[in-house]
């Protein structure tokens, strides 16, 4: 039996958050349904952030209410603080993904808080869940390979956050190349260090293809033993607080690469291409994935 790689679809959240064309909730709901029809089982569907700061993420509660609970499907809500956690719990999210930035410079611009304050917020959320219940919590360490404001990010900066999350019992930890500056060699080193810092946590990796290294970084992660990768249908993506950051690795391109190499993903690359074209028509931007241009093979 071939090894299975789980792909977390982040198009409805990370993919859309930086688009100028603000979509209404019904279009976002339809996009999620199309992705699920293509085989996506874990989808970062919404973000519980202030809609005044990120208008594209408005309507999170409406979207969650419109998605029927289904066994085997997980709709993830992004959370930055206790207020976001409370909204995620009230909306019956299947998972909450808490983000902690690896640098103060990015954290203050993106979340209005430095690293120490963000880690404290994570601790508050974890303890609140222990007392009151709520969905499983994962952590994403953003700008884990480089920061648009502070430049290089050291391995020690990243592993300090990973170690803190592990001490709190966070079960899944992701390292995110938010601005697309990572390379496969550094990726392997960060994975090794994260495993030492959090030996019991499941690792997930999140790459952008800003400088053309996204798929190489994803494959390096798989070779290093990582079984969970984020990707965005159509290669949508960016960050409103990260200048020049462009799209995530395209889900359909990642599926093509992995399945050609003999891995299982459970996703239909052709259906993903069509979903990418559908959402592209609504935001006025064609998908940037290679598969949407060249098609699959054979």
Regions found by a protein language model. Name each.
Residues 1-298:
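Catalytic cores and adjacent flexible loops of soluble metabolic enzymes
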């Amino acid at each position: 039996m071939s090894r299975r790689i789980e792909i977390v679809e982040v198009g409805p959240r990370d993919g859309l958050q930086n688009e100028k064309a603000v979509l209404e909730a019904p279009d976002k709901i339809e996009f999620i349904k199309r992705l699920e029809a293509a085989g996506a089982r874990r989808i970062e569907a919404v973000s519980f952030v202030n809609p005044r700061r990120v208008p594209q993420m408005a309507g999170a509660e409406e979207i969650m209410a419109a998605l029927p609970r289904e066994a085997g499907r997980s709709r993830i809500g992004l959370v930055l603080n206790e207020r976001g956690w409370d909204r995620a719990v009230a909306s019956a999210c299947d998972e909450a993904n808490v983000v902690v930035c690896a640098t103060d410079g990015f954290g203050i611009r993106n979340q209005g808080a430095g690293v120490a304050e963000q880690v404290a917020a994570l601790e508050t959320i974890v303890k609140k869940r222990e007392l009151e219940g709520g969905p499983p919590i994962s952590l994403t360490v953003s700008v884990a390979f480089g920061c648009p404001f502070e430049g290089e990010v050291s391995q020690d900066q990243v592993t300090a956050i990973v170690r803190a999350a592990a001490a709190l019992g966070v079960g899944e930890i992701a390292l995110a190349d938010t601005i697309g500056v990572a390379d496969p060699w550094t990726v392997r080193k960060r994975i090794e260090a994260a495993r030492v810092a959090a030996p019991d946590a499941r690792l997930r990796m999140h790459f952008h293809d800003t400088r053309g290294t996204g798929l190489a970084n994803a494959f390096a992660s798989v070779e290093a033993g990582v079984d969970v990768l984020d990707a965005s249908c159509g290669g949508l993506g960016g960050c409103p607080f990260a200048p020049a950051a462009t799209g995530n690795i395209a889900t359909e391109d990642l599926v093509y690469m992995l399945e050609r190499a003999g891995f299982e993903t459970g996703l239909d690359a052709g259906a993903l291409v069509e979903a990418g074209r559908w959402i592209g028509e609504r935001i006025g931007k064609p998908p940037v994935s290679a598969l949407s241009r060249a098609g699959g093979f054979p």
